[in-house]
């Protein structure tokens, strides 16, 4: 047996509790929710957080293992990006949330076309910024580019994603909002 050094990635304790039954139940329910929905109308979104963590350390693990996780409550955040795409491979413009009180012009100097840029104190998406993403990027795309019929939006189950405003708009526009299990 040989071992190799890897940097562990951080995972929150509640994410480490996900069971096989949780995953099987999710996919059983998802199958029913996708019935009658065109692939062009099925979307998945996810936030990616880019960090500057000078405290990362290597650990010993088996060769061939691409990554190793370690359970930690917090990480130092720089900015977050929300990505969203359809089941047919259409990518919506991203939204970038910087950790700052004010937006600096230089951050948008080479902006991605139709991307949205915002700030929060933490650099994470919150209810306000998620609503902006939903209205300006996702709902805008649904209204202007999707086929008739039901739509599905699949993503994280963070509390800030479930504002009354977003839920009302999902109902109004025939969008089935499906939360992933903690992962």
Question: What does each model-identified segment do?
Answer:
Residues 1-183:
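Phosphate-facing sequence motifs and polybasic nucleic-acid/acidic-lipid-binding regions
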């Amino acid at each position: 047996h040989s071992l190799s050094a890897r940097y562990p990635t951080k995972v929150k304790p509640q994410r480490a509790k996900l069971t096989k039954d949780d995953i099987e139940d999710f996919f059983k329910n998802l199958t029913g929710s996708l019935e009658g929905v065109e692939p062009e109308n099925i979307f998945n979104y996810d936030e990616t957080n880019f960090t500057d963590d000078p405290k990362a350390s290597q650990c010993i693990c088996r060769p061939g293992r691409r990554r190793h996780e370690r359970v930690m409550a917090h990480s130092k955040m720089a900015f977050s990006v929300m990505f969203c795409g359809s089941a047919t491979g259409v990518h919506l413009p991203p939204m970038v949330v910087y950790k700052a009180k004010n937006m600096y012009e230089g951050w948008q100097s080479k902006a991605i076309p139709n991307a949205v840029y915002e700030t929060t104190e933490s650099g994470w998406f919150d209810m306000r910024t998620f609503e902006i993403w939903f209205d300006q990027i996702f709902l805008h795309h649904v209204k202007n580019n999707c086929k008739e019929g039901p739509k599905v939006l699949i993503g994280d189950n963070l509390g800030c994603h479930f504002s009354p405003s977003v839920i009302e708009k999902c109902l109004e526009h025939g969008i089935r909002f499906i939360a992933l299990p903690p992962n």
